[in-house]
UniProtKB/Swiss-Prot annotation:
Origin species: Cupriavidus pinatubonensis (strain JMP 134 / LMG 1197) (Cupriavidus necator (strain JMP 134))
GO annotation, biological process: alanyl-tRNA aminoacylation; negative regulation of DNA-templated transcription
Keyword Repeat: no
Gene Ontology CC terms, in alphabetical order: cytosol
Protein name in the entry: Alanine--tRNA ligase
Swiss-Prot/TrEMBL domain comment: Consists of three domains; the N-terminal catalytic domain, the editing domain and the C-terminal C-Ala domain. The editing domain removes incorrectly charged amino acids, while the C-Ala domain, along with tRNA(Ala), serves as a bridge to cooperatively bring together the editing and aminoacylation centers thus stimulating deacylation of misacylated tRNAs.
GO molecular function: alanine-tRNA ligase activity; aminoacyl-tRNA deacylase activity; ATP binding; tRNA binding; zinc ion binding
Gene: alaS
Protein purpose: Catalyzes the attachment of alanine to tRNA(Ala) in a two-step reaction: alanine is first activated by ATP to form Ala-AMP and then transferred to the acceptor end of tRNA(Ala). Also edits incorrectly charged Ser-tRNA(Ala) and Gly-tRNA(Ala) via its editing domain.
Family membership noted in the UniProt record: Belongs to the class-II aminoacyl-tRNA synthetase family.
Keywords: Aminoacyl-tRNA synthetase, ATP-binding, Cytoplasm, Ligase, Metal-binding, Nucleotide-binding, Protein biosynthesis, RNA-binding, tRNA-binding, Zinc
Cofactor, free-text remark: Binds 1 zinc ion per subunit.
Localisation per UniProt entry: Cytoplasm
Amino acid sequence: MKVSDIRSKFLQFFESKGHTVVRSSSLVPANDPTLLFTNSGMVQFKDVFLGTDKRPYSRATSSQRSVRAGGKHNDLENVGYTARHHTFFEMLGNFSFGDYFKREAIQYAWELLTKVYQLPAEKLWVTVYAEDDEAYDIWAKEVGVPTERIVRIGDNKGSRYASDNFWQMADTGPCGPCSEIFFDHGPDVWGGPPGSPEEDGDRYIEIWNLVFMQFNRDEQGNMTPLPKPCVDTGMGLERIAAVLQHVHSNYEIDLFQALIKAAARETHIDNLNQNSLKVIADHIRACSFLIVDGVIPGNEGRGYVLRRIVRRAIRHGYKLGQKTPFFHKLVADLVAQMGEAYPELADAQGRVTEVLKAEEERFFETIENGMSILDAALADLKLKGGKTLDGELAFKLHDTFGFPLDLTQDVCREQEIAVDEAAFDAAMNRQREQARAAGKFKMAAGLEYSGDKTVFHGYEKLELPQAKIIALYVDGAAVDAMQPGQTGVIVLDNTPFYAESGGQAGDQGVLKAGNAVFAVADTTKIQADVFGHQGTLEGGALKVGDTVQPQVDALRRARTVRNHSATHLMHKALREVLGTHVQQKGSLVDADKTRFDFSHNAPMTDEQIRRVEDIVNAEILRNEDTHAEIMPFDDAVKSGAMALFGEKYADDVRVLSIGTSKELCGGTHVHRTGDIGLFKIVVEGGVAAGIRRVEAITGDNALHYLQKLDAKLNEAAAALKAQPSELVPRIGQVQEQVRALEKELERLKSKLASSQGDELAEQAVDVKGLKVLAAQLEGADVKTLRETMDKLKDKLQSAAIVLAAVADGKVSLIAGVTADATGKVKAGELVNFVAQQVGGKGGGRPDMAQAGGTEPGKLPQALSGVVEWVSAKV
């Protein structure tokens, strides 16, 4: 039974039992930036189990794409070396949300395994939680499993309810006993039944886990029965496929064998048992589906996990002798195997291939040098009897050659060498500190502050009647007073000035007190809740304790908030037009424009840009209210607010709803979408592999841009004596006229070449029966020189000829020798003789050669020596 059949039979079976077939969710968990990747079937139903989400069904079944790499769920180092570890796997599952419970879950599992998949009942063992008599009795008395094949597993992990057979989502919340089903491969395979000292052997393999969410656990550890118990089951597709296909390793199933053969084809390897081929076959699945779901190779978060997996695959290809990109070529083979079950993979085939190819090309530039250094270090270490690689070297490989630490560890592990992780971490932390120090705003570097926080009023107000100066800094040092002309930083107890944060530039404006005026050039954060107003005291004097009137530059703020609000609308529009793989990778919003970096692998087409503009401007025309609300982080993400993975959020966050966009954001925004006025994208380009950048303008900036564009359009129309509406067809007419004139010019040049040929032929000098000619043609291009050369060779029949022309201070040369004379005179040598005298060089065939030069003033003398040079040859 093929993998595809096993998957479809599972889903069809549970659909026949009243379950709704739910498509696999993304590998990037929706609205849960705390979870690196989806790693089980229940992730997309987490809120249903917690009671915070309701679905229109109470029974569900799915085949969930899952990844375990990075974070606490990390199988990376074992992949390729064991029979059942993978970075990517599919989890088959059936779920009950307060519908059926243990009896039906157990009976369904047994029916599927023994009736549909036709596994021998005598080969199946089960485990139950030691105190779960209900499940035990169902297995023994209703299903009929002999008691000798039912194993009770107690608290075997050091504390109450800490057991392989007791599941809990977290320290508190839904939990309950579970029952696992094992397949017995028979006495020919070493290993003992679950719960025995030999349980880690390969004879008894767990194939299905049935979790019974029966209790709610509080902070004191008290267990309270749930009013509506739930069921969550998971069966690894690769594991059950190995059992049904009568093989002991997941890598022997049909899907993996096809990918292993494809990897062998691209790496030119005949031995299909190479562990490196297994690594490559596993990794192409994880990498491809991560890219499908919007992850792009990068240096942090999910992007760095993807980069690590890609580079591990490349290293194993390199180990097999592959020195050029190969990994991306396996995407087509993966689509052939899994594209029908997951059409999103087939749809994204081109994008996935391009992203992987770009990452391969990047790493292949450095892998050879990096591996040479690592191999030399390991050889030296072995000679000295060492067992640990220097962490500083591992860091150098990471920093200079792009070797993730686990890749270096992978290479070392193959030679039974450890890596000094502590030294690696120390080097990494040292670099981070240096980068952090170098990146500090120079005015804020070293500022020491331990006073009160700044209270921000800028959401509602642009000026305050008074605010107190609570700290002053000049040249990075705290001072009591500031004198006219001095530049420094002022901290206020209250301010309407927005401090640079979240990609939004800090406010500008003034602080006034009597005749004292402090011009604020920028506002930044000295600490998380302490705002530094940086600028110059243009008049008067200020001291700590003085009261000032803060006034934000209203025009600049208005332009900034228009750009910021438009960014939110644009982000949503980009995801709508390009796909949900689009994720924010950086932004800068100021009064002039919004700059937005996002994950996408191809340049946007003109049509896509227009669609994004249309969507945003439609939101602007609807003129809907903007709403900001403070709420707990968990509630915010559950409400659908977009959060950025890797960002650190407080317990309470600000949710900004503008139009159809909903994001976590602490920035300042318009009151209504109509306040943005107008939105226009002015720049689209690439900034890194898989990262695009869009720049856009709004409001009066957009209007002025379009007015300038209109003025240029009118100017161009006037130059062509046309109305702006007639410009395109008029340009077409002009282009047609230009083409006609160019054609006529070519005809005239050809005619000129013919007439010049007749005249030049008469200038040829006879040298021992060979006609020799060296001449400069006025106004000729290279094509004309060639045509003239051909006519002269035909006319003179036996000849050695050099023709030259000068244009834009450069010399063009062509030498031609008739076939009867090439034994003595070579065109390449002849043209070089002339070219070297005019600052150039050239070459070509014995009968025709071309050259160029940069010193036209020396051309007459160079041509005058041709006859003598040919005479010496013949």
